[in-house]
Amino acid sequence: MKKQIILCGMCLALAGMMGCNPTSDSVQVNHLQVEMKNNPQGIDVAHPRFSWQIHAGQPDLVQTGYRIQVAASADDLKAGKNLLWDSGDVKSDQSLWIAYEGEQLQAKKPYFWRVKVDTNQGSGKWSDVQTWGMAMLDANDWKGQWIGENALSNPGEKDQGETRLAARYLRKPFQVSKEVKRAVLYISGLGSSESYLNGKRISKDVFAPMPSLYTSRVYYNVYDVTDMLQQGENLLGVVLGNGRYFSMRVPGMLTTGLPSLLAQLEVEYTDGSMDQVVSDTSWKVTSQGPIVANNEFDGEEYDARKELKGWNTVSFDDSAWKTADVMKEPGGKLTAQPNPNLAVQDTVVPVNVVARSDGKFILDMGQNMVGWLGVKLKGKDNQPITFRFAEILNPDTTLYVANLRSAKVTDIYTPAADGEFSWHPSFVYHGFRYVEVSGLDYQPSTTDFAGYVVYDAMSTTGQFESSNALVNQIHKNAFWGIRSNYRGMPTDCPQRDERLGWLGDRATGASGEAYLFNNALLYNKWLQDIEDSQNEAGSISVVSPKYWEIYADDVTWPSAYFYVADMLYRQFGDDSAIRKHYPSMKRWMQHMEEVALKDGVIVNDTYGDWCMPPEEQHLIHSQDPARKTDGAILSTTVYYDLLNKMVKFAELCGQTADIPAYQKLAAEMKEAYNAKYFNRETAQYGNNTVTANILSLRLGLVPEGFEQKVFDNIVRKTEDDFGGHVSTGVLGIQHLMRGLTEYGRKDLALKIVTNETYPSWGYMINKGATTIWELWNGDTADPAMNSANHVMLLGDLLIWYYEDLAGIKCADDAQAFKKIEMAPVFPEGLNHVKASYESVYGKIESDWTRDGNRLDWRVVVPGNTTAVIRIPKAYGVSVTSHPGVHQVSNTETELVVEVGSGEYRFTSK
């Protein structure tokens, strides 16, 4: 029986309308953003960029023009008068990153904007009015001083070794005697802060502001507090935790100083007058509050007997407090924070609490998570209750803490009286599944606890499910692991005495993560951390911010600087990172040529193919030379790829004079590399590791005509020597899944994913993992480096999930999914995949089910985009004309259907 693909648009149910012109009401503009933020405060760029999405009830929606208006008040904007910018009618399909081109914007002022669009289906109405607020645009805009308590005032406090310090409480009363038009707080509380106005939290942000290299850059936050002020006396209060400013370990980790506050409250009255409340010596401070210690590695200690009832309200008596000290300035440039702070984003309900014979209780959250434990318990006066955290249990049900190294990860709460209390820490987080609770004299219930999941405030953008439960569980583990390690920087791990922004973990990982989360603002900020950590010679620290200062002059770890910038352009259409960081990237490229280029290859390498599966399961790193890839192979292949990236970046930045030098060096390196490392008789690179061959193949160094032979070596090595299992470390895994699939072995790629024996992701899951381990052998390896919550071994797996299994991929000749390539590989062994990705243009969906040679595939293409849909001819396809279908063509192996926006369904008949 002949099979036919039936293509149905989402509007077929409205077939009677197909001949009618849609009214303008059907064209909707939403998801309006300034610099990828919704109605943001604290924009400090001179030409903010606007973006939006469009939707309509009919398929094939294309924007043909837009008009943007900006004014200093919402009333003026609605009336269309006193406009600061009117773009006029611009004929364009661009709906992302359109720069403001009006009158000069003023520091600290609010602005209002709206947009309307023209489309091929009619013109829309003006959008709802949106707003943004400008930040400080000059250092002279700041009038306050850095203040705090410039002493170790409490017993046991220390600024060396395992540091210990109490939180600082600061307060400032002030008067409001007139009607308030607008009030905005500009604040930087280092290391972390909580802010209050008249007893109420100003925001839900936690661990604010973002961590940075404080001697280079200090971030501040901006909050509109207009509705929180009251006539008469008001009280501004701030609590300061240590964060990364007062470091957890000294020496060993970079430390900057004692916690410090810079704040400026600007109050504008309806009569046009202004007041300022600034941080200075008129503030009061104390460290004699209930948070007697806070250290991100070691935990928080809270003594309820020292609570300062009402300290952040007007009526509190602060006569026992000290006058605030003027603190040493951090030294870094004050910068409006470009990305949101961390926030509580999810809650985990414990699955079990078990009493031990020693009187302690073990709480099982059921999920390795990062954040803090909230409790509602009954305590006894002056009897501390201790909460100790771990990812894993020992066989005897005690906590396994060996992999935490020196981190104590312990919170202590001391009740003020007998009775019930509720509490969670403020300035620490833990990576944990299990909690040991001691100090209770009764059996608690699971309902007495809640796990609060804390990570950078960002939206979840990706959903994925398939017919294979293990494939789904790996995705779930990845989801939990990734958000666990978003801590204002992408960290390596959330639990031990490290928690650093290692560059090597994210070179490719950031691209896969971008399918699950809208991580653009976080990674833009991290690129600034990397630049701030670059030294005068041009070398890049492999940890950024450089809390560990490691200038290894390695290639593979710093490559993340380039790959992440490229990801932001490809995934989100934002080229600003490439333009901003191009000079620093060029400096690093030149530096590496000077220190590491020898006879046409890069000879420096520090980390190798980090964490490839060792031959003995107690090892962290393989000791077998046959498993190790030559460091010069790793460095040269990656540097060659970066030269090609720099050609692209130079063209984008208008630095075309740089291009010939990059191209010349790339050609010379390719020739020298192959002369030194490629065996033409065997088509092997170096000692024939999978990593050596797949990097050479995917990064374009294999001589023409040898590609298939090199790939055959990859397959033989994988199947014959490793039984169809992973044999790569951090570098090889970045290319493994896509490389196997691109050259026709999607079956082997799926086998690697669905393996349940060592080494594999399935092995981790069978051993109880609910996140991704640092090591393939995380259940048996030396605890010195054995995190149970890392993401570096994901490599290109998530990219493969969304692009190859689901078929959601940005076309090579487009950015930001303006043109979508939908070509699932339909591997045998998977009968169903359903996935979606919330792109900057809107949601893309792919939902396919296969039964033998019958296919049912539903796709959704968002407004103002197009898609190329590729269907294997094995399903016996034919397509007739239909609204939204632009073109149908055939190749030898597939039907190619080019469509506009809409919902379509392909079903074998």
Regions found by a protein language model. Name each.
Residues M18-G19:
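C-terminal motif of bacterial Sec signal peptides marking the signal peptidase cleavage site
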Residues A183-I187, L197, W372-E391, F427, ...:
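Alpha-helical support elements that line or immediately flank enzyme active sites
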Residues L236, Y302, D497-E498, L516, ...:
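C-terminal capping/lid segments that line or modulate ligand- or cofactor-binding pockets
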Residues M1-Q4:
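Positively charged n-region of N-terminal signal peptides that target proteins for export
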Residues G191-S192, L262, D280-S287, Q443-N477, ...:
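Active-site acid/base region of carbohydrate-active enzymes
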Residues V239, G257-E266, V278-G310, A336-T347, ...:
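Non-catalytic C-terminal accessory modules of carbohydrate-active enzymes
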Residues K158-L165, I202, M210-Y214, D224-T226, ...:
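Alpha-helix capping and helix-loop boundary segments enriched in small/acidic/polar residues
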Residues D25-P110, R114-R496, G504-D505, L521-L522, ...:
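Extracellular/oxidizing-compartment recognition motifs
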